[in-house]
Amino acid sequence: MSIQRESIIGSRRWSNMIWCAILVTAGSGFWFNGMQSELALQGAIMCFYGSVAVTLSVYLFLTIWWDVGGGYNEYDTENKSITIWRRGFGNKTIFLKYTRDQMQALKVVVKDGLNPKREIYLCTTTGAQIPLTAVGEPMPLAELEQKATQLAQWLNLSLVGMRA
């Protein structure tokens, strides 16, 4: 089989849905309590915080609804190309297609610490670095290494490592 398709999970995750529910519940509570408050300044501040929380929950709901960041990577060895398709905000799509001549290497970035980062990038001849892994929980190092070497062999590219 010469075509390999890999699904990428976008913003349609349980953690985002839980945060959206928490924000809309807490924001509505703040807003209603602010409206019922007998102290004008305290009520106005609570209404403001409630409005901000509800606005953020609407933004998060739309991000989940449109599944921003979701899509697929398609690796084709027969045509020697890679296709990257993602959903963007406002239901816009991002479609990138690179031939073997435009690909330079695969880059692995590993950053430990408070905000760990473990990602695989496609480096192009123009200098662009396109992420191939999904955003979210960083994958284990063994899985990242296996996936990167498999992709490098599949696409016949060199593998460049970087530890930050």
Swiss-Prot record:
Subcellular localization, as worded in the UniProt entry: Plastid, Chloroplast thylakoid membrane
Segments crossing the lipid bilayer: 14-34, 45-65
A Gene Ontology term for the protein's cellular component: chloroplast thylakoid membrane
Gene Ontology biological-process annotations: photosynthesis
Record membrane topology: Multi-pass membrane protein
Subcellular location, principal: plastid
UniProt entry keywords in alphabetical sequence: Chloroplast, Membrane, Photosynthesis, Plastid, Thylakoid, Transmembrane, Transmembrane helix
Pfam families for this protein: Ycf4 (PF02392)
Function, as annotated: Seems to be required for the assembly of the photosystem I complex.
UniProt record similarity statement: Belongs to the Ycf4 family.
Protein name: Photosystem I assembly protein Ycf4
Taxonomic placement: Eukaryota, Rhodophyta, Bangiophyceae, Cyanidiales, Cyanidiaceae
Name of the gene encoding the protein in the UniProt record: ycf4
